[in-house]
């Protein structure tokens, strides 16, 4: 049996979590993806498959303010922006989907900043 790569293991964890975590119009899903360089967050209504709000470190307006900061500080900034955009769209409560990543480091920093920004999960 071949050894599974870390990416394959993460995808398996994500599938396992997604069996139970569903976003609704009243309580959409806050989905996080983390790459080696960037972090992305989306607020998704799974009933219609639509993204209601999104933020990431690749956006030009965010990227300019994040130069010279650590990846954890960048994740905090993305968490604050996603909370602001979700609240502007009328979203107060979300279900957190960590995307198969450990709830530690950048993923935790993004979640804490989103909570501090007013989102409840």
UniProtKB/Swiss-Prot annotation:
NCBIfam families: L18_bact (TIGR00060). This is Large ribosomal subunit protein uL18. One of its GO terms (biological process) is translation. Part of the 50S ribosomal subunit; part of the 5S rRNA/L5/L18/L25 subcomplex. Contacts the 5S and 23S rRNAs. It comes from the Bacteria. InterPro entries: Ribosomal_uL18_bac-type, Ribosomal_uL18_bac/euk. This is one of the proteins that bind and probably mediate the attachment of the 5S RNA into the large ribosomal subunit, where it forms part of the central protuberance. Transmembrane segments: none annotated. Belongs to the universal ribosomal protein uL18 family. One of its GO terms (molecular function) is structural constituent of ribosome. Keywords: Ribonucleoprotein, Ribosomal protein, RNA-binding, rRNA-binding. One of its GO terms (cellular component) is cytosolic large ribosomal subunit. The gene is rplR.
């Amino acid at each position: 049996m071949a050894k599974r790569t870390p990416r394959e293991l993460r995808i398996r964890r994500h599938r396992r979590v997604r069996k139970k975590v569903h976003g609704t119009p009243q309580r959409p899903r806050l989905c996080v993806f983390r790459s080696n360089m960037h972090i992305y967050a989306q607020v998704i209504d799974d009933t219609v498959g639509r993204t209601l709000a999104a933020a990431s470190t690749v956006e030009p307006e965010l990227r300019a303010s994040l130069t010279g900061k650590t990846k954890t500080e960048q994740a905090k900034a993305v968490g604050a922006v996603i909370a602001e955009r979700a609240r502007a769209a009328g979203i107060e409560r979300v279900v957190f989907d960590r995307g198969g990543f450990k709830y530690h480091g950048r993923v935790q920093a993004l979640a804490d900043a989103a909570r501090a920004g007013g989102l409840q999960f």
